[in-house]
Each structure stands twice: as structure tokens, then as C-alpha cells.
Amino acid sequence: MSVQSAIKRKTAPDIRARKGGDPIVMLTSYHAHTASLVDRYCDVILVGDSLGNVMHGFETTVPVTLEMMILQGHAVMRGSQHALVVVDMPFGSYEASKEQAFHSAARILKETQCGAVKLEGGVRMAETIAFLTERGIPVMGHIGLTPQSINTLGSFRAQGREEGSWEPIEADARAVSDAGAFSVVVEAVAEPLGRKITETIAIPTIGIGASAACDGQVLVLEDMLGLSPRAPKFVKRYGELGPGIEAAIKGFAEEVRSRAFPGPEHVYGMKTKS
């Protein structure tokens, strides 16, 4: 048995069993190198469709394709060993029918070897979630602010902050849980609502701008590292890597232009005859 195969990777049932226990730690990653770093400290690595914003410069996640998700999902699997890897199902890959969702999700699992998929939507996607889980595909749900719905929402604004606006979101949470999802991301909702959902559904909630009471938390890696020029209110910057990277690039450019780089230690001399 190889060392790689002997290492136990976390599974969807492992995460499901964490309900009410130690907080679940989740970050995004899209590359093998960052995945190897995130893997040391996180329970779950999300290959998010936010790669459309972070890697490709799209304004929204809508243009992201299934092929993009599979390519980066495979890279993250190669770079990680311990964490459960969850790959987002992109817009247009699952909404048309349960069968479309199954074929897309099966491709993701087969071609990346990840442990689960994530899809957006509550009540409207409950039948699809049940269809997938009954066929051996673990599903993480996503309710509250659902970025793939930006064209109908109109803007990225927090949900459940108005009087009488909780019930549809609570219904979404119940539907996802009852359909068999192993966990659910709750994004950008009023804090009391995030707390209530966590207390009332059977599966772990993973908050992103929801509540400290959630069973876990997730952020986009580039946001928390200070690499994104703009970040939502719910992001805490744990680093400011942007200025450091810019300084390194500037230093390289200056040394190339002044011919200070490469120096003697960076080039190869002739071999001497023995």
C-alpha cells in the first residue's frame, strides 16, 4: 500500500457527524499548491465557482463552466491529502433536470475524484438533492445569498434582514436537510436567522456572513489573505499579501531593467575538464 493510499481523507459522513461538535473549518482553493497549505488546517476544501471571479476576472460566477470546475477540482485533489474536497456545480449544469444534475455531478466525481459536490438552492432544488444522494453522490447545499442567482436578485445583498423575510430561507434550510444533504452553506443572512437555522436543522451549517453559532465557517482564500481588492463585510483579513506580492514583482522588474538580475549566483559557468 502506498503512503498516499494509507492516508485517510475526511468524508461527507465525517462532516455530517460534526453537527453540534467542534467547528468545521473550510476554505476555498483552486490550485494544487494552495490546496497543500489549506489541507494542513482545514476539514473541507471548497473548489468554489468563485474561481470565476478570482482566477478569470468575471464579475459574477455565471460564466463558469463545468470544464473549469473539473480542471481545478482535479488540481486541488492532487495537492491535498486529508481534507474533504467539495466541488461547486456551476450555473447551468444542474438546474434543467435531475438527470442533468446527475450527469454533471457524476462527471465531477469521476474526473476529479473529489468527495462531494455543492449546489445552490433550497426548496426548488430539494428533489434534485434527494435524487443525487440516493444515487451515491454526497451533496452540500447552499442557501441564503446564492451568487448564481445574481441576475434575478439584482445585487449581492444580505438576506433575511427585513421583517417577515425569514420563512422562505428557513424553508430552504429544512428542505435541503430533509433531502439528504450532508451539510449546508448559509451565506449572508441576518445573524439571528443564521443562529436559528443552525439550532433547528439536523445537518451542519457552514456560515459565510451568517453567525458564529453556525457549525462551521468558510471564506474565499484570496479574500482572507488580502489578495482581493474588494471584499464583503463578512470577510476578516488574516493577511495582507497583496502589497508584499506587488513589492516582489516591482523588485524583479527593477533588477531586470538595471541588469542586476540574474547575478553570478543565478547563472551557469562552463564545466572544467578533469
UniProtKB/Swiss-Prot annotation:
- InterPro entries attached to this UniProt entry: Pantoate_hydroxy_MeTrfase, Pyrv/PenolPyrv_kinase-like_dom, Pyrv_kinase-like_dom_sf
Task: Give the cofactors, semicolon-separated.
Answer: Mg(2+)
Q: Where is the active site?
A: E187
Q: Top EC class per UniProt?
A: transferase
Please give the CDD domains that the UniProt record associates with this protein.
Answer: KPHMT-like
Q: Signal: is it a keyword of this entry?
A: no
> What does the record list as GO biological process?
pantothenate biosynthetic process
Keywords associated with the record: Cytoplasm, Magnesium, Metal-binding, Pantothenate biosynthesis, Transferase
- What is the UniProt remark on how the cofactor binds and its stoichiometry? Binds 1 Mg(2+) ion per subunit.
Pfam families for the chain:
Pantoate_transf (PF02548)
Q: What GO annotations for molecular function exist for this entry?
A: 3-methyl-2-oxobutanoate hydroxymethyltransferase activity; magnesium ion binding
Localisation: Cytoplasm
GO CC list: cytoplasm
EC number of this enzyme: 2.1.2.11
Function as written in the Swiss-Prot or TrEMBL entry: Catalyzes the reversible reaction in which hydroxymethyl group from 5,10-methylenetetrahydrofolate is transferred onto alpha-ketoisovalerate to form ketopantoate.
Oligomer status and interactors: Homodecamer; pentamer of dimers.
Q: What is this protein called?
A: 3-methyl-2-oxobutanoate hydroxymethyltransferase
State the species of origin: Rhodopseudomonas palustris (strain BisB5)
Lineage, highest ranks first:
Bacteria, Pseudomonadati, Pseudomonadota, Alphaproteobacteria, Hyphomicrobiales
